[in-house]
């Protein structure tokens, strides 16, 4: 049956049809919907893990146990999962295992533009990259076949445009694979040095076998047209190329982007007069072609940053672009702001009022850096606020103590904040950490987390008590405030900054957009009574 699906939903459908049994992920745009959609299939056990490392390890455990598995994350989440990734490449798997990773060229919702293909190369793990929803579904099923045939986890690399664009897919029924037998195999699965040394040559042979597979797999296909121009491309760039050129260029479309074929590329290059490489972000395909001794045009014309478009491809290839309607440049700029009623506003107002130096983190509350609050000084990655305040205070000593705080959301705290908090307790840092507990993972679309008491399906689940956790870590000063109570917030911040020991303030009020939050009638300014004191 044909259906219209976004790419992420198509991957989820592929998981279902291929008989995936376990999916563990951490939400992160643009990857989130894969697991949300997979959770709609009762045959797949789905969960939100505290972070991407845990998710990958859960999927690995399920694969070793004999059940096809999946873990999903955005590109920066792969940094968190890198530790087990490199070792699992050595151990291999039992049942098939897919690692879904979504890159964000253009940084629509990310702090950097890293290219996940580097991880596939470094970890020596095969990577598939679809260019539309139909391929997303089909490639997912093929990925399990590759995983089990070559004893390896397999990357399914998405990007924002493929993940969130709709196209037609052909669905089929689920094929339920038998649970594979688990056999204890210390030499294969226990990566102490002696065993790892024996596994490394196996990994290298696997790569050679996969290169041979890349030469003939239908994942990579040649579309011959005009031979004056030859283009090697992948993912959404393929769609742009076809829209610009049609049959006026010959195209080698790569779906298996690690490892890359050699003979296939060399044969294609011989059939065209001039060879171009069109790929978003880094020059992975281009570098491979140059290693093969080919004269190619790539990043000397196409940018290393931002996402591509049809117009960009046409412009860089010297093809006239039809003029389109231009926006009225006088339209007011509308930068992102916190939602009306956002509980984080009260705490950031307090911190700004007290002229605190604020180490920020990743979440909706990163918008606390935006005017008029302008409260956050530094934001790097998830969990960095707590570790950074420790380093900041150790570096500046009494000069910064009593003036610097860290802010982190409840989900981010569970993701990677606990180790930083343990470091503060262990190394006796006089630092104040504010956990902004809005009872949900807000920025990625209201996903549950270990502090909410509900699982991915909305059913009751275990709930972490933040106050008890902080006290168990050795913090004597732990207090809870309502960020709507500005006086209480101001009092708490002043008292904890003045204390001569580390402390935690939990700023707790549910996200204003949660369905179960009681919404009071909106307030209006009485212009006749307003004194113009700018209190609002």
Predicted regions and their residues:
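Flexible, low-complexity linker and terminal segments
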Residues: 1-8, 12, 18, 130-338, ...
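Thiamine diphosphate
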Residues: 1-133, 161, 224-225, 248, 369-504, 517, ...
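Short acidic, glycine/serine/threonine-rich loops at helix termini
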Residues: 34-37, 60, 81-85, 107-114, ...
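Short helix-loop-beta junction
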Residues: 37-43, 242-252, 468-474
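A glycine-rich helix N-cap at a beta->alpha junction
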Residues: 43-50, 91-102, 184-185, 426-439, ...
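Conserved thiamine diphosphate
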Residues: 104-153, 159, 194, 336, ...
